[in-house]
Structures are given as C-alpha cells and as structure tokens.
C-alpha cells in the first residue's frame, strides 16, 4: 500500500518518466505554498524574460536545418516553462552540450502510449510513430529567467557549432 501511494503521488511511477499507474503531482505543502505566494509578484517579469530567451534561441537556430524550434501561434503567449527543440542526433547533441557545460534535459523520453499505465489500451511500439520519433528527438535547453543574453547566445552557438 505504501509503495502504491508513493507511486500515485509521484506521477504514477517509482522511476522518473516511467509510469506504472496514472498518478498526480501532489506534493505542495504549506511551506511551498508560502514560497510560491511570495514569488507571485515576479511571475510576469520572469515570464517575459523566458519569452525573450525563447525568441533569442529561435532566431539564432532558425537556419539550422537539423533543429526544429517551437512553433508559436501569433494569438498565443507561451510562458516557456521549458524550451524544447526537436533535433537530429539528439543523444550526440546532449553529450556535446554537457561537455561544453550547458545544462539540458530530455523530458518525457517514453511516449504515453508505451507507458505501463496505459498498456491496457493495447498500443504497441510502432503504432504511433510520430510520438515515438518525437520522444527520440526532443531536448530542452536552459530557459530560466536569470540567464544572461551572453549565456543564451553561448548555448545557441554550441548548438550551431555542433551541426556545422
């Protein structure tokens, strides 16, 4: 019972990005709520900084054919909690960025239809090829508001250099 409860509270899995049951992220306690309340006045400024960083990345990487940047519809104003690219040779790029001191992450490396918690739906590998392809191509770049323009430019330069 304890193991199942822990899984339910951690998105449904004991291991990150591998879900055995459908769960939630329900770890907000009073202390975290107080901290978030204190940060709320800064949210608009932080969101604008993230949008600026995203625009810088997108502009710098626009002519790199191996990189697909996020598509932003003109009527939307994303916050860019993550800035996720789809790239060729993702694992090699990830290692390259790490070797250059650039943090990066692969969120959701296993598509939903291949998670254990959805196995009863009967989807097999190959059934949703675009989702599987995306899971193998996505990489997220640093996007936190405190980044400097020089740091964002450095990350973009490291990616451009990798694909030359």
Name these PLM-found stretches:
Residues 3-164:
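PLP-dependent aminotransferase class I/II
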């Amino acid at each position: 019972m304890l193991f199942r409860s822990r899984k339910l509270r951690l998105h449904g899995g004991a291991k990150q990005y591998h879900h055995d049951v459908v769960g939630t992220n329900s770890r907000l306690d009073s202390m975290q709520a107080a901290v978030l309340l204190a940060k709320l006045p800064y949210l608009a400024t932080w969101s604008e900084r993230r949008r600026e960083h995203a625009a810088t990345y997108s502009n710098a990487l626009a002519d790199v054919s191996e990189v697909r940047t996020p598509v932003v519809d003109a009527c939307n104003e994303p916050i860019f909690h993550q800035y996720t690219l789809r790239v060729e040779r993702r694992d090699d790029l990830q290692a390259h960025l790490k070797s250059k001191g650039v943090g990066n992450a692969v969120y959701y490396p296993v598509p939903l239809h291949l998670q254990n918690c959805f196995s009863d739906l009967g989807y097999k590998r190959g059934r949703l090829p675009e989702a599987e392809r995306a899971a193998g191509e996505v990489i997220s770049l640093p996007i936190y508001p405190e980044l400097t323009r020089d740091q964002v430019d450095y990350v973009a330069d490291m990616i451009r250099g990798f694909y030359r």
